[in-house]
UniProtKB/Swiss-Prot annotation:
This is Transcriptional repressor NrdR. It holds the Pfam family ATP-cone. Keywords: ATP-binding, DNA-binding, Metal-binding, Nucleotide-binding, Repressor, Transcription, Transcription regulation, Zinc, Zinc-finger. Binds 1 zinc ion. GO terms for biological process: negative regulation of DNA-templated transcription. Belongs to the NrdR family. It comes from Streptococcus agalactiae serotype V (strain ATCC BAA-611 / 2603 V/R). A zinc finger (unnamed) spans 3-34. GO terms for molecular function: ATP binding; DNA binding; zinc ion binding. Its cofactor is Zn(2+). PROSITE patterns: ATP_CONE.
Length: 159
């Protein structure tokens, strides 16, 4: 593996462990020339999955698009990068188990919203406000009422 610091092609594995709920192997490596330590990840290459967009066009599934959307929605919220990564893993696992080669962007958006509703209500509202393209304040108010009902039912169920 090429060292990102000096470009030398030989490195040794210092530590290796499972990551991302067992779907990835994380390796700590050390460059044999300069001693720089760096991390690499080994992940199973999945078959290509196409996303059918709202306009009917198709593009390859990108977990990075989901990641970026969630990160943007979770800014300045108490949501860890591990929480986000686990959220994306659950979404991707569900998509790959239920859809063979194509899935609609609407389905993906709904799965993201379901995960965010459990993770953090504010992050959920931020994501929904972009994803749902609200036309007026009444639509946002309706969403907030749904969240409020869910939060209250959770609190009353845990008492």
């Amino acid at each position: 593996m090429r060292c990102p610091k000096c470009g030398y092609n030989k490195s040794s594995v210092v530590d290796s462990r499972q990551a991302e709920e067992g779907t990835t192997i994380r390796r700590r490596r050390e460059c044999e020339k300069c001693g720089n330590r760096f991390t690499t990840f080994e992940r199973l290459e999945e078959l290509p999955l196409l996303v059918i967009k709202k306009d009917g066009t198709r593009e390859q599934f990108s977990r990075d698009k989901i990641l970026n959307g969630i990160i943007q929605s979770a800014q300045k919220r108490p949501v860890s990068s591990e929480d986000i990564e686990n959220c994306i893993l659950r979404i991707e696992r569900k998509i790959r188990s239920e859809y063979e080669d194509e899935v609609s962007s609407i389905t993906i958006g709904n799965l993201v919203m379901d995960e965010l509703a459990e993770l953090d209500e504010i992050t959920y509202v931020r994501f929904a406000s972009v994803y749902k393209s609200f036309k007026d304040v009444d639509e946002i108010e309706e969403l907030l009422q749904q969240i409020t009902k869910r939060v209250r039912s959770k609190k009353s169920g845990s008492v």
